Structures are given as structure tokens and as C-alpha cells.
């Protein structure tokens, strides 16, 4: 049973959450019940599938790695770089295997035996922890908290990507009734908002626009068809994913957790920089903190270049390409990453140009509207690439029997 | 120590505007951005022999000259 997919699921979830809500209102966390709930829902989602073993195996594997590194870094107080890199590589190995698998086994068959719903997202959690152990920010990894963090049910399929220290702080804090009432309020609202986004708006966009236009654009590509499919897909992507995120956050809120948000009016972004502070924020900030900033800091410390522009451009490329690869090893995911890197590099260059020429562009409603319009369209072009529709168009030209898109 | 920290901020950002108001938001005013923030981290780490991991740099705690000075002092005291 896919999370958040059927009314039945929500009914069961709602009923199951009632004891936790009551307990929190009475000032108690009911941790044993939370753990039971997590196990029960994981069971509902994964049982009867082979992937349940992948899920469990993955947890065991990551626990061994993280606990080893904790022992090495904290107990032994050693900090050799090569151990750090090795542990990071081991931690991402299952994910890499799962992503590379389709290259060797193309076609609609089952994916790698290591894969399970959420593997891409859980991997972020362990990698971040290893880095923070290295940095000395995490000085202890208590096993129970670690496992609950890893398998936290509301966010297991697609995030938002939480961070260990934040989660544990919340786990340990006592229940404060006013705070919980506020969280409960917001959580319920967000669940309803999620319904609106995913099951009404997203559904309607797909049913009456995206599904049909994607097929038309594939069979009879034209500027109009393709543009229309671009807007349809981008809007669908937002409402669907933002809707899911709202469910995940809302349910977590009901359980007493104030999870970080994923979207903040992304289509009002005035430039690509602003966009990445509004779109899939937990992913964007994860890459910023654990890839971009670390890489740039390494460049500067090791003095691989004196040129700040070169360093930041290489940083953007590495960051965005990695993000592209993380989505999957297809040409269009990689191009998506590369395109966003170019947007970031281009935007920085534009800022430098304005400064050099001393162009003072006024900041008013009109200029804001134009910047938003430009950013919106540049971003939607990236969504078109990401959607795979161009891939369908090309493949259909080569082989008319290639399967049509089925959004 | 505060003066040394402010000198470093000035070198990294290329401006001393922030000295007029040590509580102005350096990121909002464009005095600091992600790149300069990292340069700042590298310089501060070197100058005070402390460790400043990027993922710890919560912008809310690091966005004014005064806050930066306070954070560095805390780190120094930790060691």
C-alpha cells in the first residue's frame, strides 16, 4: 500500500493517530506507540514485497557503518580523511547500485534487489550524519534514536529530508501543550492543503491537461504542444509533490514533530538563486550544506584556485550535476542538473556584469514581475527536460512503437 | 578579538558598511553571500584555531557582525 495514496490509507492513518494526539494533548509522547505505529505502517507499505528485506538489510548495513564511524571518530578520536571517504562511499553504495542497475538491465523489469521505496531519501540522512560526526557536530549516535530517525514513517517515501540533531532535539524535548496545540492546528490544515494540492488540483491538471497533452506532444510535436506540455507538467509536478510534502509534514506535526518545509511559493522566485531557496528546500539545502559548501571550502583551504568565480562555478556544476545523477542515470536527469548549474553560473555572471557596468536597475512592481516571469520560464524549461517528454518525443521519432508517456 | 573579527569580515566582504550597524543583516544587505561566507569561515578558522563546519552555520545565528563575533567567542570557549 503506497503511502498517502488512497482514502482507505488516510482513514487508517487518522484512526491510528488519535491516541498520539490525545496523549500529546495530555503532555505525553507515547514513544512506544509511535514506534509501534511506525512498524505497523512500514509493514503495511512493504509487506508482501521482496523490498521489505532490502529495507531491513539497508538499515542493518547503515547502522553498522554509522556506529563504526562513531566509534572510530569519537571513541578512538581519530580523523583520517581516507576513513571518512571510505565510510561515505560505503554509505552511498546501495543507492549507487540501485541507480546504476537499470543501465545494465534496461526495460520495465524489477529494479535492483537492493532498492526499496525511499532509499534515495534515507541515504541523505545517513550521509549527513557521517559528515556531522566527522565535523564533531554529532558526538553520539544512540541506537534507538538513530533507527527511529532513519525509519520515521511519515517521511519515508519522499522526504522532507530531516537532520539528525534537529530530530533528536525534538524527540528529547518535553511536550509543551500550547506548542502542540499550535502544531496540531497547523498539521490538520496542512493535511487538508495537501488534499487540495495533490488530489484535487494535481489530479485535475493531470486528468484534463497533462495526460493528453504529453501524448499529443510525443506523437505530433509542435511548439504549441510542447510548450503546453511543459506548463502542464511543471504545474502538475509542483502540486503533486508539494501536496505529498504537506501530508508528510502535517502527519509529522500531528505526532508532535515540526518538520522543515519543502516549498515556499517557488513560482514567485525573482531569480534562480531565490528559486532554490523556495523549491524542494530540504533537498536544496542538503546539497548546499553537504556538497556545495564543503567542496568550496576544500577548494579554498587547499588553494586549488585563487579565482573565486572559478571556484563557485565548479561548485555549482558539481552540486547540480550530482543532484541530476541522484534523480537517476538518464540523459535528461543529468541534463537537468547541468542546465541548473548553467542557470546559477549565468545568474552570477549577470550580477557581476551589472556591478561592473554600474547598471542601476530600479526595483519596482514591473521589474519584479519581469524577473519572476523570466525565472518562471527558465525553470519550467528545466521541468520539461526533467519530465522525460523530450525523451519520449525523440524515441517516438526513432521507433513509433516506443511506449507513450503515461502521466 | 572583536576588532580582529570585524577586520576579517571587512577583508572578505570588501566593505566596512557593517561597522555603522553591527546588527545589520549581512546576507540581506548583500555584504555576505554563500561564497564569502565560506571565505569568512576559512579565515576565522585560521585566525582563531577553531573548527566551523558549514552545516552548523545556521544563517539565523551568523547573519550579523555581532552574532559572528559571539559565535567565534563561543567556539573559542568550547576549546
From Swiss-Prot, chain B:
GO cellular component terms given for this protein: cytoplasm
Domain Carrier: 1-76
InterPro entries: ACP-like_sf, DltC, PP-bd_ACP
GO biological process, one term: lipoteichoic acid biosynthetic process
Residue numbers carrying O-(pantetheine 4'-phosphoryl)serine: 34
GO molecular function: D-alanyl carrier activity
PTM summary: 4'-phosphopantetheine is transferred from CoA to a specific serine of apo-DCP.
Signal peptide stretch: none
One Pfam short name: PP-binding
Metabolic or biological pathway: Cell wall biogenesis; lipoteichoic acid biosynthesis
Swiss-Prot/TrEMBL keywords: Cell wall biogenesis/degradation, Cytoplasm, Phosphopantetheine, Phosphoprotein
Localisation per UniProt entry: Cytoplasm
Its biological purpose: Carrier protein involved in the D-alanylation of lipoteichoic acid (LTA). The loading of thioester-linked D-alanine onto DltC is catalyzed by D-alanine--D-alanyl carrier protein ligase DltA. The DltC-carried D-alanyl group is further transferred to cell membrane phosphatidylglycerol (PG) by forming an ester bond, probably catalyzed by DltD. D-alanylation of LTA plays an important role in modulating the properties of the cell wall in Gram-positive bacteria, influencing the net charge of the cell wall.
Family assignment from sequence similarity: Belongs to the DltC family.
Protein name (database record): D-alanyl carrier protein
Gene label: dltC
Amino acid at each position: 500500500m503506497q503511502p498517502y495514496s488512497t482514502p482507505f490509507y488516510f482513514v487508517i492513518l487518522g484512526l491510528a493517530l488519535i491516541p498520539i494526539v490525545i496523549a500529546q494533548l495530555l503532555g505525553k509522547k507515547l514513544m512506544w506507540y509511535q514506534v509501534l505505529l511506525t512498524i505497523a505502517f512500514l509493514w503495511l507499505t512493504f509487506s508482501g514485497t521482496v523490498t521489505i528485506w532490502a529495507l531491513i538489510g539497508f538499515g542493518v548495513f547503515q547502522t553498522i557503518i554509522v556506529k563504526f564511524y562513531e566509534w572510530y571518530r569519537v571513541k578512538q578520536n581519530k580523523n583520517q580523511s581516507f576513513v571518512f571517504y571510505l565510510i561515505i562511499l560505503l554509505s552511498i553504495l546501495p543507492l549507487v547500485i540501485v541507480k546504476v542497475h537499470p543501465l545494465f538491465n534496461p526495460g520495465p523489469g524489477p529494479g535492483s534487489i537492493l532498492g526499496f521505496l525511499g532509499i534515495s531519501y534515507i541515504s541523505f540522512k545517513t550521509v549527513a550524519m557521517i559528515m556531522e560526526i566527522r565535523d564533531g557536530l554529532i558526538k553520539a549516535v544512540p541506537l534507538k534514536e538513530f533507527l527511529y530517525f532513519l525509519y520515521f514513517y511519515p517521511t519515508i517515501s519522499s522526504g522532507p529530508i530531516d537532520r539528525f540533531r534537529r530530530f533528536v532535539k525534538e524527540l528529547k524535548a518535553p511536550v509543551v501543550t500550547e506548542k502542540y496545540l499550535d502544531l496540531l492546528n497547523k498539521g490538520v490544515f496542512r493535511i487538508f492543503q495537501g488534499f487540495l494540492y495533490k488530489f484535487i488540483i494535481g489530479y485535475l491538471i493531470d486528468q484534463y491537461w497533462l495526460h493528453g497533452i504529453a501524448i499529443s506532444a510525443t506523437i505530433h510535436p509542435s511548439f504549441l504542444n510542447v510548450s503546453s506540455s511543459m506548463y502542464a507538467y511543471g504545474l502538475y509536478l509542483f502540486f503533486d509533490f508539494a501536496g505529498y510534502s504537506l501530508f508528510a509534514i502535517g502527519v509529522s506535526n500531528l505526532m508532535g514533530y515540526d518538520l522543515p518545509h519543502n516549498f515556499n511559493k517557488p513560482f514567485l522566485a525573482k531569480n534562480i538563486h531565490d528559486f532554490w531557496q523556495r523549491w524542494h528546500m530540504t533537498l536544496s539545502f542538503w546539497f548546499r550544506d553537504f556538497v556545495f559548501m564543503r567542496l568550496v571550502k576544500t577548494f579554498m583551504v587547499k588553494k586549488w584556485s585563487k579565482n573565486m568565480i572559478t571556484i563557485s562555478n565548479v561548485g555549482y556544476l558539481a552540486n547540480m550535476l550530482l543532484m541530476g545523477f541522484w534523480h537517476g542515470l538518464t540523459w535528461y536527469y543529468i541534463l537537468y542538473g547541468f542546465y541548473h548549474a548553467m542557470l546559477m553560473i549565468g545568474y552570477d555572471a549577470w550580477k557581476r556584469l551589472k556591478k561592473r557596468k554600474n547598471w542601476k536597475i530600479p526595483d519596482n512592481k514591473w521589474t519584479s514581475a519581469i524577473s519572476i516571469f523570466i525565472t518562471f520560464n527558465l525553470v519550467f524549461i528545466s521541468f520539461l527536460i526533467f519530465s522525460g517528454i523530450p525523451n519520449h518525443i525523440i524515441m517516438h521519432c526513432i521507433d513509433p512503437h516506443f511506449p507513450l508517456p503515461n502521466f | 578579538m572583536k576588532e580582529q573579527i570585524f577586520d576579517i569580515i571587512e577583508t572578505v566582504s570588501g566593505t566596512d558598511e557593517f561597522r555603522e550597524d553591527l546588527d545589520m543583516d549581512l546576507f540581506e544587505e548583500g555584504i555576505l553571500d554563500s561564497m564569502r561566507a565560506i571565505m569568512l569561515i576559512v579565515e576565522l578558522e585560521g585566525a582563531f584555531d577553531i573548527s566551523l563546519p558549514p552545516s552548523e552555520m545556521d544563517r539565523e545565528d551568523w547573519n550579523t557582525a555581532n552574532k559572528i563575533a559571539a559565535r567565534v567567542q563561543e567556539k573559542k570557549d568550547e576549546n
